[in-house]
Amino acid sequence: SKSSTETPPSYNQLNYNENLLRFFNSKPVTAPVELDPPKGESSYVSSAREDARSTLSPVHGFEGSGGSGSSGNFTTGSNVRMSSVTNTSNAGTGTSSAGGNGNGGSGASHAPPVTVTLTESLLN
């Protein structure tokens, strides 16, 4: 007989394999992962693609809280292509690392972000 201290399997554990099979048998449409999206795309379009990628990816579906699309799942996809942005419109604001709108925190610039490739010489 089983020990009385053993925890019975949860509903989710019992249905895990069945859910996996049903998911992959439905042949979900998955978006390809692009590390370098085409240049000249507005940040709105690339963030929409980011949303679609995290929604459609079978890997993200089983992370975190059962694939409900929590913010924990989304950050893994969005951190892939953060760029270092130099804000030249306002003197004294310097450089800032921005992954979103690229305004460098000043809010005054509406120009597209200037992408600077981070190299060892820039760090020295």
Swiss-Prot record:
Main subcellular location of this protein, as a coarse class: nucleus
Localisation: Nucleus; Cytoplasm, Perinuclear region
Ranges of biased composition (kind: Gly residues): 97-107
Keywords for the protein's UniProt record, in alphabetical order: Biological rhythms, Cytoplasm, Nucleus, Phosphoprotein, Repeat
Stretches with biased composition (Low complexity): 71-96
Post-translational modifications: Phosphorylated with a circadian rhythmicity, probably by the double-time protein (dbt). Phosphorylation could be implicated in the stability of per monomer and in the formation of heterodimer per-tim.
Origin: domain of life: Eukaryota
Positions of region (Disordered): 30-124
Keyword Transport tagged: no
GO CC terms in record: nucleus; perinuclear region of cytoplasm
Any one GO biological process: rhythmic process
Oligomer status and interactors: Forms a heterodimer with timeless (TIM); the complex then translocates into the nucleus.
Record function comment: Essential for biological clock functions. Determines the period length of circadian and ultradian rhythms; an increase in PER dosage leads to shortened circadian rhythms and a decrease leads to lengthened circadian rhythms. Essential for the circadian rhythmicity of locomotor activity, eclosion behavior, and for the rhythmic component of the male courtship song that originates in the thoracic nervous system. The biological cycle depends on the rhythmic formation and nuclear localization of the TIM-PER complex. Light induces the degradation of TIM, which promotes elimination of PER.
Protein name: Period circadian protein
